[in-house]
């Protein structure tokens, strides 16, 4: 209903009632054309346990899940590509060299980053994944396959994509590769025919934010070109605003999906552990943040003022800030 209301907000109706009727009709038509994934209620709840609209109070409101033939087909295609080992690979000797040597900034790969490189570079999956929690050295982990690919396939053999222009620019700055946002790349591909090259590695950052149909289209183009796609992200972070979930689907389809586990961002050891606990939704970690005086309360005005004061102080000190 919310999506229908959004799509019809510019339409004019004689009365509010007319708008509500049309909204309901469009929503009903969309429901009829969709595939219902949530099973129906097999038992009727007593009247005192039913809402005014007749639904059971034992089932959350608006919790029915729908899909479509095209979306399910896209998921199947992505799973198949993730199980297909016909993509370009890197020699194990090159992987060993990259693992043992520091990069241009003097960074040496940690054990989890080195394992991730071997998992991504050697098997030859057409679509591969890398899970990188916040602060776990994702940039260094992505830089490793870039170095390996350019060693064997030459300059320009690694390109980047991301669901947003901002994320694409960050990826370009971090890895020093050509990048584009996924929507722009697909539009250019449709109008000009420009596509990937055989042997390339395509890194799609913030992959949990990418919609499933978009990933399916891009990975199909990559498969046809003889290119490997590496999806990098964190399934525990924000999902796509469109029909998404493909990244999480691919992660949980494997028992050996590479995941970075060593958090580098924080100075204090307790905060490294706590950030991962919070990521997994383990509520007891809130006590840790309370004990470390990291949780403060107040009304909206007081909290806003405190945040601004802290921001201004850090800025005056020349510190990095949001």
Task: Mark where each language-model region is.
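Conserved RecA-like ASCE P-loop NTPase motor core of nucleic-acid helicases/translocases
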Residues: 128-172, 229-232, 260, 294-297, ...
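Conserved helicase motor core of P-loop NTPases
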Residues: 77, 86, 115-116, 232-322
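Substrate-engagement module of ASCE P-loop NTPases
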Residues: 222-231, 235
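Beta->alpha loop/short-helix hinge microenvironment recognizer with preference
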Residues: 1-126, 131-136, 140-152, 165, ...
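Conserved Walker B
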Residues: 134, 206-210, 235-236
